[in-house]
Swiss-Prot record:
The lineage of its organism: Bacteria, Pseudomonadati, Pseudomonadota, Alphaproteobacteria, Rhodobacterales. Belongs to the complex I subunit 2 family. The gene is nuoN. One of its GO terms (cellular component) is plasma membrane. Keywords: Cell inner membrane, Cell membrane, Membrane, NAD, Quinone, Translocase, Transmembrane, Transmembrane helix, Transport, Ubiquinone. The chain crosses the membrane at residues 7-27, 33-53, 76-96, 108-128, 161-181, 196-216, 235-255, 272-292, 297-317, 323-343, 369-389, 402-422, 442-462. It comes from Jannaschia sp. (strain CCS1). This is NADH-quinone oxidoreductase subunit N.
Length: 483
């Protein structure tokens, strides 16, 4: 019944109605008067919806004849997306106000992007997949170019739009091939057509094009070319958003497509995903070494981290998917904490992103410097921080799946990547103070966000805490996807 179908989409419907109410409210009030309240209200609603999904979710359900799937896997991804988007909205308030970017459109566009992400991770059909992906993408194209008086921001939005349209074209072409040779757009029908050793060649080409389109969305090399420029040119809160929620959505969608639609031909996509993983890990690790802008560094860092997440996915097992989900949850926490600090990097009242400005920061702000040290070491995978356990999980999954060569490559890439994280720590503690150093000022909410994430990352390994209990939900989610 239609009412049962709509009940499954309750969070998406509530968020969409809230976005429309926000638009109407802005029309009938003075310009941007509701912007700050709208941001806080949106963050609160995201948290409420995450709690609602966690409490009410049970088993697996389908809506609209299998186009939408509500299961443990989609719920895990949705909760991660909602909480990360809420955190980004909260830590961005000070920056957006100072930069005169606090417009009512900002939270509205974030809501629409999040709704698109939630549809993506619940997609059980190529049409639902494409609808969710385009809703997310169209909203993010706009927010990337929000700073209309900045050439770099406009350039970032244009590059993201052009290359995003190319990736959408690849995805759509692959979907059309899959539909043509499988005779259906539903994942359940495609996996039946792909079973056995006689998969149509056209369906294999469809898989390749779909994989290429999804690789663009997760910033996997060699489809990463948009990431550094868009990260650098976009307003920093938007960069923080790009580095968190959309990555979770795209990676979850990637997992759902390869397992739900092409789970019967793991051998055909496993090597492709493994190739994407190893190229991403090494390109991100090596290219980040020479960066002088911390936002570009975080862009290459995200490329490398997506390679590690793809390593878990390439295992083709429930253990691999579980490791990928754990890795993405930890990755989001690390990036929220890091960007909470980047958002407040100021010199003489002006926002800066030069890595050199961190020189001797520890002598001014020892507490903040210690929190950043925790973030950097965790991103590098130094034990016993959470980042180490995330990498350990995907490495073990790869080894257990027989991909020993990929695990060895991951260890080497991790060692290379540790250099640029340690360089930041070295600058903070052993660099020479000069006139280009940071002011050290930080708003209350970003400061709380930084310290909270540092505590999460630093204490997650403690016995009794056990990664804050994300292992059991991740295991359930993986088992639900690979059934």
């Amino acid at each position: 019944m239609i009412s049962a179908d709509l009940a499954i989409l309750t969070p998406e419907i509530v968020l969409s109605l809230f976005a429309m109410a926000g638009l109407l409210g802005a029309v009938y009030t003075s310009k941007d008067a509701l912007a700050s309240a709208m941001c806080w209200g949106t963050a609160a609603l995201f948290i409420i919806m995450a709690f609602y999904i966690g409490v009410t979710g049970n088993g697996a359900r389908e809506a609209f004849d299998g186009m939408i799937i509500d299961d443990a896997f989609s719920r895990f991804a949705k909760i991660t997306i909602l909480l990360s988007a809420a955190a980004i909205l909260m830590i961005s308030q000070d920056y957006m106000a100072k930069a005169d970017l606090l417009r009512f459109e900002f939270p509205v566009l974030i809501i629409l992007a999040v709704v698109g992400m939630m549809i993506m991770v619940s997609a059980g059909d190529l049409i639902a997949l494409y609808m969710g992906l385009e809703l997310q993408s169209l909203a993010l194209y706009v927010v990337a170019a929000m700073r209309r008086d900045s050439v770099r921001s406009t350039e970032a939005g244009l590059k993201y739009f052009v290359l995003g349209a190319l990736s959408s074209g690849l995805l759509l072409y692959g979907s059309s091939l899959a539909y043509g040779f499988a005779g259906t757009t539903q994942f359940a029908g495609i996996i039946e057509a792909a079973q056995g050793g006689d998969m149509p060649l056209g369906l294999l080409f469809g898989l390749v094009f779909i994989t290429a389109g999804l690789a663009f969305k997760v910033s996997a090399a060699p489809f990463h070319m948009w990431t550094p420029d868009v990260y650098e040119g976009s307003p920093t809160p938007i960069t923080a958003l790009f580095a968190t929620a959309p990555k979770v959505a795209a990676m979850a969608l990637f997992a759902r497509v390869v397992h739900d639609a092409f789970g019967g031909v793991i051998g055909d996509w496993q090597q492709i995903v493994a190739f994407l993983a190893v190229v991403s890990m090494f390109l991100g690790a090596i290219a980040a070494i020479g960066q002088t802008d911390i936002k570009r560094l975080m862009a290459y860092s995200s490329i490398s981290h997506m390679g590690f997440a793809l390593m878990g996915l390439s295992a083709g097992t429930a253990q691999g998917v579980e490791a990928m989900l754990i890795y993405m949850a930890i990755y989001v926490a690390m990036n929220i904490g890091t960007f909470a600090f980047i958002l407040t990097m100021e010199r003489n009242g002006r926002h800066v992103t030069e890595i050199s400005s961190l020189s001797a920061f520890a002598s001014k702000e020892p507490t903040k410097a210690l929190a950043i040290l925790v973030m950097m070491f965790s991103l590098a995978g130094v034990p016993p921080l959470l980042g180490f356990f995330g990498k350990y999980a995907v490495l073990v999954a790869a080894v257990d799946a027989g991909l020993v060569w990929l695990a060895i490559a991951g260890v080497i890439a991790s060692v290379i990547g540790a250099f640029y994280y340690i360089r930041i720590v070295y600058l903070m503690y052993f660099g020479e103070a000069d006139e280009g150093a940071l002011d050290g000022k930080m708003g209350l909410v970003p400061y709380v966000g930084l310290i909270a994430m540092a505590l999460v990352i630093g204490l997650g390994w403690v016995p009794g805490v056990n990664l804050f209990g994300i292992e059991a939900p991740a295991e359930t989610a993986a088992a639900m996807l690979i059934r």
